[in-house]
Regions:
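A conserved short coil-to-beta-strand element within the FAD-binding core of flavoproteins
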Residues: 121-135
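Short beta-strand to alpha-helix junction loop
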Residues: 56-59, 91-112
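Glycine-rich FAD pyrophosphate-binding loop
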Residues: 23-43
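N-terminal FAD cofactor-binding segment of flavoenzymes
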Residues: 43-82
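Core beta-strand elements of the Rossmann-like FAD/NAD(P) dinucleotide-binding domain
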Residues: 142-149
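Single conserved hydrophobic/aromatic residue that forms the stacking wall/gate
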Residues: 230-237
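Central helical "cap/lid" subdomain
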Residues: 36, 149-195
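N-terminal Rossmann-like FAD-binding beta1-loop-alpha1 element of flavoenzymes
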Residues: 4-28
Length: 237
């Protein structure tokens, strides 16, 4: 029987799994096809692809700075340079703001953390039971897993739905609404545009990333990740 079952392969889930794996048996499960959670990388062909979730990291706390510094030293992360166009008039620009990205994709952190751990994809947790101090986990694909301990690293609404029967916390009384963050993955003919990103001042269009500027690949087309949020779109209607 497993010592620990971790649900979610994002940065939090993968970091916890790596630490636990030093002393315990650990398996990780995720409903998606690949690793990364909110930092997923959409592969087009070979190394060519898009960061369609997390666009970059900009560490603030001392601990996270140490964490990213070590990953940069190990060439898991790198600095995203270039000309980043700051157009937003409601946010103050920080001159010391840095942008860190994965060397091959922004799911590189999770891949690195989970490289020696068994990961199961397309496993969406649908039901939880606890019997004789053992967690019985039922997935939508029909599989049932038993584990001594359970760690859930998934969005709040999903967590509340699955765990409110077993976990007593005032946090579940909070009314949390998660709005969609929509991203268009766009391919265009090669242009002379030399900007790495745009932080716009538009009510709908929030962010544009030039994926080619991340220097992970060379390609005869330009790749763009264009993002906006449900809230911004709703405000205009």
């Amino acid at each position: 029987m497993l010592d620990f079952c971790v649900i979610g392969t994002g940065i939090s889930g993968s970091t916890i799994a790596k630490l636990l794996n030093q002393k315990f048996s650990v398996n990780v499960y995720d409903k998606a096809k690949g690793i990364g959670g909110r930092s997923s990388f959409k592969r087009l062909n070979g190394k060519i692809g898009f960061d369609h979730g997390l666009q970059y990291l900009s560490p603030r706390s001392l601990k996270f700075k140490r964490f990213t510094k070590e990953l940069t030293r190990k060439k898991i992360l790198k600095f995203w340079g270039g000309n980043h166009k700051f157009l937003n008039k409601s946010v103050k620009k920080k001159n010391k703001h840095i942008k860190l990205i994965g060397v091959n994709g922004n799911n590189d952190i999770s891949k690195y953390q989970l490289k020696n751990i068994k990961c199961y994809h397309q496993y969406e947790l649908s039901k939880i039971n606890r019997l004789n101090k053992v967690w019985n986990l039922q997935f939508q694909n029909g599989q049932v897993i038993k584990s001594k301990n359970l760690i859930v690293s998934i969005p709040f609404p999903q967590c509340k739905k699955l765990l409110s029967k077993f976990v007593r916390t005032s946090l579940f009384k909070n009314k949390v609404i998660m709005n969609s963050s929509l991203t268009v993955l766009l391919m265009t003919n090669k242009t002379s545009n030399n900007y790495s990103s745009y932080f716009t001042n538009d009510k709908i269009l929030g962010w544009v990333s030039n994926e080619n500027s991340k220097k992970r690949f060379t390609y005869n087309k330009d790749l763009w990740a264009v993002s906006y949020t449900h809230l911004r779109a709703h405000e205009t209607t």
